[in-house]
């Protein structure tokens, strides 16, 4: 079945996602952004060198700066950072078709409420099915046509499989899930752990420490996901372990680079920190973990370091001298 798909958000990920769906050739795809001049340039030049240098966008991809462009779309993907999603949903939600499925592509938790993004979408758009797309995929890799696999989760498997079929292509494969909680929290919490791994790298304390953080961080993620109603198996999949390994080891990751800067003792630009999803997620996850009585020492340490409440050397000592326990 052919779908009409709108991707909202003309940053790197939104543009890459729109391009790879358009290349699959099964759906009519429109990339929707707020900047009329940018969208006109993308339409005429088929290049978005500011975020995806040298990558030619497909001729079949349409562009629009009009909110009304989402009208008639059967699938609408919100591909902007988590803290900007609520405003975007309110702006574009007025124009959605009554049967449109909405998909959040952000990896974060609402900072003020601690809610998942699907909670926000269901609150703002109560008449629409809501799904989440997450997993190990850098925008540049997706746009270049490098093999990438991610997860898409909806309330029902029928909807999840429909979305996976509509969005997947030769080089971009989606796995269907019904665990929206696990898929979202994996995407949010791995950013915190990527910052921790960046601190380790910036501090120069070895790959063994990074491996320990990945393994023990995965245990933290699993405890948190299960406590919030998700499934432990999801944490071991693409949206959990897969995304964690990618983000904690690749310098394409903003979160890893932010952690490296912290580890080196560099003065971090507040504007840079504002773009790092893990910087938001750390404080929210640490607060929620305390409310749920969940042990998350790595997440707590990252939150305290970012807030300036804990020195990195003290954080390392605290983690290494915790009471001995079973794995």
From Swiss-Prot:
Pathway: Membrane lipid metabolism; glycerophospholipid metabolism. InterPro entries: 6-PGluconate_DH-like_C_sf, 6PGD_dom2, G3P_DH_NAD-dep, G3P_DH_NAD-dep_C, G3P_DH_NAD-dep_N, NAD(P)-bd_dom_sf. Its EC number is 1.1.1.94. Sn-glycerol 3-phosphate binds at residues 107, 135, 190, 243, 253-255. Its main location: cytoplasm. GO terms for cellular component: cytosol. It is an enzyme of class 1 (oxidoreductase). One of its GO terms (molecular function) is glycerol-3-phosphate dehydrogenase [NAD(P)+] activity. It catalyses: sn-glycerol 3-phosphate + NAD(+) = dihydroxyacetone phosphate + NADH + H(+); sn-glycerol 3-phosphate + NADP(+) = dihydroxyacetone phosphate + NADPH + H(+). It comes from the Bacteria. The keyword Metal-binding does not apply. The active site is at 190 (proton acceptor). Catalyzes the reduction of the glycolytic intermediate dihydroxyacetone phosphate (DHAP) to sn-glycerol 3-phosphate (G3P), the key precursor for phospholipid synthesis. Belongs to the NAD-dependent glycerol-3-phosphate dehydrogenase family. HAMAP family: NAD_Glyc3P_dehydrog (MF_00394). This is Glycerol-3-phosphate dehydrogenase [NAD(P)+]. It comes from Rhizobium etli (strain ATCC 51251 / DSM 11541 / JCM 21823 / NBRC 15573 / CFN 42). The lineage of its organism: Bacteria, Pseudomonadati, Pseudomonadota, Alphaproteobacteria, Hyphomicrobiales.
